C-alpha cells in the first residue's frame, strides 16, 4: 500500500472557498487500488504552511506529496517545475504578513526543482483531453513559499514532492468572468496525476519549454 499526501489551502483573499481544499476533500474520500490518500488542510500563513505539511509528512510517512493551490486566471491544470527562494507578497496572507523581497530560507539555494515527473503528468492529462500546461513559475506568494519550503526539507529524502496549480471553480469564476474548471474534471485529473507519479520512475522527454 502506497501513501499519497494531498495538501490544499484554506480560502484567502476574500474568497469563501478554495478549489484546492475542495479537491483534497473529494479525493480523501475516494478509494484507489493499493493507494492510501491522506488529506491535509494548509493555512495561508507564512511558515505555518510549511510546518503544517512537514508535520503531516512526519506523521504519515508518505511515498508522494502533492501540494495543490489555486491559480486565478489560469485555464488549465499547471504542474509547477521550480520553486524560488523568494517571498514577495502582493497581498497579505491570512495572518497579515506581507513580506517584500525576502528569502524564504536565508541559507537556502536560489531554487529547487519539483521531483514529480512533471512532463509525464502534463502529457498524460493532455492525451486524456484535460487542459494541462507545464508552468515555470509558482508565483511569490504562499504557494511558492510552501513549495520551496517542502522541497528544501525533502530534497535529500526518498519522497517525491511537488506543486500543482489548478483553476478556479465555476462558482468562483462566474462573477469575474475568469477561466474555471469543474470539480469533476479536477478529480479526474488529480487521479491521473497520482497514478502517473506512482508509475513513472523517470520523467519523459516531451517539449514543455517556453520562448519567454
Curated annotation (Swiss-Prot):
Its GO biological process terms? proteolysis
Q: Which UniProt keywords apply?
A: Cytoplasm, Hydrolase, Protease, Thiol protease
Q: InterPro entries, from UniProt?
A: Peptidase_C15 (IPR000816), Peptidase_C15-like (IPR016125), Peptidase_C15-like_sf (IPR036440), PGP-I_bact-type (IPR029762), PGPEP1_Cys_AS (IPR033694)
Q: Where is the active site?
A: 80, 143, 165
Catalysed conversion reaction:
Release of an N-terminal pyroglutamyl group from a polypeptide, the second amino acid generally not being Pro
GO terms for MF: pyroglutamyl-peptidase activity
Keyword tRNA processing part of the UniProt annotation: no
Assigned EC number: 3.4.19.3
Q: Which GO terms describe its cellular component?
A: cytosol
Indicate where this protein is primarily found. cytoplasm
- Give the quaternary structure: Homotetramer.
Its annotated function is as follows:
Removes 5-oxoproline from various penultimate amino acid residues except L-proline.
State the family it belongs to: Belongs to the peptidase C15 family.
Q: Which HAMAP family match?
A: Pyrrolid_peptidase
- This protein's name: Pyrrolidone-carboxylate peptidase
- Organism of provenance: Vibrio vulnificus (strain CMCP6)
